[in-house]
């Protein structure tokens, strides 16, 4: 049916009658701006919904797989090296602390000195849940730069102490907290720049600590014997200053929550009228993912004896092999094979689909526990070197695939807090293990029982991790089943709507015929 000319004319007359009397609006006249009273609450909500759809739910950008990301990788590599190289070489500082602050009548000196290193390592991981919140709110760059500055202050203040007790705060708390704030953003930022090569890049980055673990024991051994403990700590401050500069390379691709809020406030015309509810700081919904909850429980369970060799191995060699002068070569062996393991197993992880990467961590915990229990059985120094080579290889395997597994379990958006929670849980066993080993040494006169006990938890934790692929696959089957059921319901609903509409058409046709 073609519309007649009379219908537009009638519509025009109705429009003119509805308008109030007054001058006709010209084309040059400015359009009226609606005030607060001219806009209803329903329209406000509609505008906010549309703005949220257009700005709030954008997909994260695709990782560029290179470019500036290579510089970010090098900066993250320096971060891992400077933070964990110093921590892994604490055995050298441990011996120097015994000589500098130890007294002949103090029978618990090994216990006290072990607390400094274990507290430092534990605080690095304990602060990670808090660091994850800072990373989400302020971004990787600001968090890393702040952490490096705090670490510099803590390490510098540690060089001016005259007894071991102040080191609990300056080295064990301040320096460690700064390292934690600098370390975790280096893991998170890599997932923004890489996806296909994430396993390899994580292997390269975490290999930084292996390189530093090779070099720092020799450097610290020479420095402590020539300039003393205090000046050695001041020289280590240079590493923190370089880390401070490296943090500026973490250019964000995914905006932080503060940046998202500022964008929303700029783009929303009615942002001042209605405020969104405050965002939850800690994302505890992660633990509803059963596979992640098991992972976050199994790894800390395996790490009760993990840090014991790094703290007490040097003193064990000093007591057991008194004629050996190059004790630092053991840390060099751990560092070399740890770097190889990070690169090798990081690349292997890229070929393992999904959460099956967890099996590599199970394998690594088995060999870490076995080598720890075999340390007291070594009667020659060469056998101890062989054990350290094996331990370093599988230590690199465990560390390099931690971030890729987190991305597989919870996705890139929640990976920051997932890693933060895990590292926070890891702080408890890593803090407790070395002091207990030092206490056993002070009471029994040797480290034999301490190393035997340190090898048991990795077997238990590895057994728990074996459940993760089964749990994850079961969850995926349930999701696919529910998705299939929803699709079937939609298909049936569409068919019923088609049938009802067709029956209505037939009814109208029959009525018209009648």
Curated annotation (Swiss-Prot):
The cellular location(s) given in this protein's UniProt record come to:
Cell membrane; Basolateral cell membrane
List residues in topological domain: Extracellular.
Answer: 87-113, 165-170, 221-227, 312-328, 372-395, 440-450
Which segments cross the bilayer? Answer: 66-86, 114-134, 144-164, 171-191, 200-220, 228-248, 291-311, 329-349, 351-371, 396-416, 419-439, 451-471
Main localization (coarse): membrane
- Source domain of life is Eukaryota
Enumerate the Gene Ontology biological process terms: aromatic amino acid transport; thyroid hormone generation; thyroid hormone transport; thyroid-stimulating hormone secretion
* Disulfide cross-links: none
Which residues are annotated as modified residue Phosphoserine in the UniProt record?
A: 262, 497, 500, 502-503
Q: Which residues form a coiled coil?
A: none
- Any Pfam family the entry gives: MFS_1
Task: Recount the PTM note.
Answer: Not N-glycosylated.
Reaction(s) catalysed by this chain, per the record, are:
L-tryptophan(in) = L-tryptophan(out); L-tyrosine(in) = L-tyrosine(out); L-phenylalanine(in) = L-phenylalanine(out); 3,3',5-triiodo-L-thyronine(out) = 3,3',5-triiodo-L-thyronine(in)
Q: What is this protein called?
A: Monocarboxylate transporter 10
